UniProtKB/Swiss-Prot annotation:
Known partners and oligomeric status: Homodimer.
Protein name: Adenylosuccinate synthetase
E.C. designation(s): 6.3.4.4
Binding site for IMP: D13, E14, G15, K16, N38, A39, G40, H41, T124, R138, Q216, T231, R297
GO biological process: 'de novo' AMP biosynthetic process; IMP metabolic process
Cofactor comment text: Binds 1 Mg(2+) ion per subunit.
Cofactors: Mg(2+)
Primary enzyme class: ligase
Lineage: Bacteria, Pseudomonadati, Aquificota, Aquificia, Aquificales
Catalytic reaction(s) noted: IMP + L-aspartate + GTP = N(6)-(1,2-dicarboxyethyl)-AMP + GDP + phosphate + 2 H(+)
Annotated binding of GTP, by residue: 12-18, 40-42, 299, 325-327, 403-405
Family: Belongs to the adenylosuccinate synthetase family.
Native species: Hydrogenobaculum sp. (strain Y04AAS1)
Keywords of the record: Cytoplasm, GTP-binding, Ligase, Magnesium, Metal-binding, Nucleotide-binding, Purine biosynthesis
Amino acid sequence: MEKLVIVGAQWGDEGKGKIVDLLSKDYETAVRYQGGNNAGHTVIVEGKKYILHLVPTSILHKHTKGIIAQGMVIDLEVLSKEIKDLEVLDIENRLFISDRAHIILPYHKILDRLFEKKSNIGTTLKGIGPTYMMKYARKGIRMVDLKDEDIFFNRLEENLEFTKELCEKVYNERFELNKDEVAEDIFRLFKPIEKNIKNTFKIIQTSKSVIFEGAQGVMLDIDIGTYPYVTSSNSSTLGLSNGTGLHPKYFTDAKFVGVSKAYTTRVGAGPFPTELKDEIGDALRDFGHEYGSTTGRPRRCGWLDLVALKYACDTNGFDEIILTKLDVLDIFDEIKVCIAYENFEDFPSSLKDMENARPIYKTLKGWKATTKAARDKSKLPKEALDYIMFIEDYLNTKVSMLSTGPAREDYLYL
């Protein structure tokens, strides 16, 4: 059985969607196992752009089954729209949703907004965090619960009362959600996909080849990321077992691949040691079109942080790294990479230490030649190859592939 795990090695937005699309064409089954519609994978196929938030990217291959596994939280409105947008690909009979996956409800989004006003973490306000919060408080509503109206209405009523009290007594805000209206909307969206609700654990276990698609990135992982400026799930390889229901031994023969940009970006608040708030940062953003596919927010940009990337490799066991957006660096005479932080030997776990981390840079010669759409290693400038070799040596991990542009065909193997 062939198993491939693709995970973002930075703060998300590394270009995983295209990589997954490229590598998944021979796989029988594709699995999303954590997160929700707080991340978007963008893929361009035959000139048409697809932005997928919940449905696995690999389902764009017409022979591939797509699984939304138990570790995900699902906004039924968003899922319904994605299925409709992909109607031409006839995905309805190839998409399976875990009966254990939790559902995002309107009160989760209200709570998200209220929490964000207090904490300013930089959440997408999609209700993701509060859905996970209620999951772990044992107050969540799962897909399977929609098949039993008594369970659903009891949970819904309890959660609406809890949210109403929180809104009115703690945040001094009116709460106007109506139980019957919420239920009507949920069942309207649920009925068309009810046939797709399955025990997805069994489907994965019996598949001959499986690709696992991570969302966000290692540095946003709830446990090993830059806490508290993280997402609400394990967006690293740590989330595989609990996100799918598969035991850890299942993954012992899997290949783990991390995807990283040739520089670093981050959306929202949180520590970012190599951030550039100057014309170089602006150039990276403009030339790299660095705006979030889900939020449209401009991304913060900076030089490649090898300290953070090495930490991601070590904590996730990456067998290979795939480097994206190398072509964005074509415009620079010199390129810097962070090889250490002042006063810190290891990647800090303390927020205060991370905010005070000062990068120590190594300056490498730029290539000032186009690598855009390069599809052959022999066509790459020597300085670009030197840059890749420096990264490999520092990480002690092979860079196996480059993405050199947005089109599906813009890539090369090393």
